[in-house]
């Protein structure tokens, strides 16, 4: 399994478990490896929204849509 996949899996698991700060850390590390992935930007946005950081979440959703305008999950 690649480092990127491990980071994403850890992020998703922590997000589902309510460990939002840890999830955010994993998604941010994954974005360092693949900054052009709209799904990662969306996951980061979901995590930030869960933390109540709505403005930052909105920016992540916008970035996701810039990368893939067809991504309805970000809209």
Model region roles, listed by residue range:
Residues 5, 39, 73-74:
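Start-of-helix register in tetratricopeptide repeats
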Residues 29-32, 62-66:
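Conserved structural position within tetratricopeptide repeats
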């Amino acid at each position: 399994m690649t480092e990127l996949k491990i980071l994403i899996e850890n992020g998703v698991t922590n997000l589902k478990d309510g460990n939002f700060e840890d999830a955010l850390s994993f998604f941010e590390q994954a974005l360092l490896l693949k900054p052009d992935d709209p799904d990662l930007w969306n996951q980061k946005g979901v995590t930030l929204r869960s933390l109540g950081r709505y403005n930052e979440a909105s920016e992540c959703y916008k970035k996701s849509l810039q990368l893939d305008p067809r991504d309805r999950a970000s809209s």
